[in-house]
Amino acid sequence: MKDDLIKLINELEKEREYQKIITMIEALSDEDKNSKIKLSLAKAYSHMDEFDKTIEILESIKDSESNTSIWNYCMGHSYYYLDNPSEAERYLLKALEINPEDKPSNFLLALLYHELGDIEEPEEAIHYLNKSLNYFNVYSKLDAEEDITEDLISIEQKLAWNYDKLRNHKEAEIHLRKAISLGDNEEWVYSQLAYNLRSQERYEEALENYQKVIELGRKDTWLYSEIAWTYFLIKKPQLALDYMKKAKELSPVEVDLALITRTASILLALAEHKEAIKMIEEVISKEEYKNDINLLSNLAYIYIDLKDYNSALTYLQRLKELGRNDEWLNKNLILVYSKLEK
């Protein structure tokens, strides 16, 4: 009878009739429920997203089944969906210790480590993402049933992002190009690659990739500001200003401090000191920006560049009153005082 029952359960599993399996097994007496049948019941509850019930049943057959990969996988699977990653990891690793070629365990552990890689700390994120990559690679060699291309692309993107955060731009570039080789042709990957290349001072290559991003349809403040700054870095300030104007037109905010700072540098390169001063003074006339350290520092620098040391001193002293006390400020105070004494 039990053989016939298990055969019927297997057929219902193929048809994904999990509620029928639950109803049928729950109707049995305790004597008729051996560990194999209870394991099937646990799996059925798991498919119905009743993970606490799944664990309860699995615990009841722990003595006879905990040395099997399927029991450990089911425990890991349940804890994964109960958002308990440490327990999920423990059982999935045990499943693979018993059977290293267990496809579901390799796949789920890869997903788990991928998710654990979504953290701010770059070194720790890289640690988890590399683990995820390793398990996906094992899974891919086991006659994989799932298409993992998008997962692999996502991991390569995140590895690149974290290496860029660590300023390891060469390693980041390797992962960005790997993502592209896997089929990633989205705006994000080329935006990141362009930023990466600019960080490596490979400006012409960066500009080529920024143009690729535009061709893919992205047109926003960040992109045009990045292009502008790249042109500024290769000493093409007029082109830089043209793109900065596009960036400002698309800015979602009235005052974008990052744009203002970059625009000021570009205007100085064009010897448009008065225009830079006018732009910054217009912003600091607003109550919320009147004590902005960065803007006031820019004004002081512009006046020093103009050799208007009295005006420069006004802003340097204001910066000191606001609490700035660093090498830049002290060096420029000494410079200004020395010029005014002559």
Model-predicted regions and their roles:
Residues 3, 36, 70, 104, ...:
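Start-of-helix register in tetratricopeptide repeats
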Residues 27-32, 63-67, 136-152, 249-254, ...:
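Flexible helix-coil transition and linker loops at the boundaries of alpha-helical arrays
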Residues 16, 49, 83, 117-120, ...:
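Residue-level detector of the short coil/turn that links helix A to helix B
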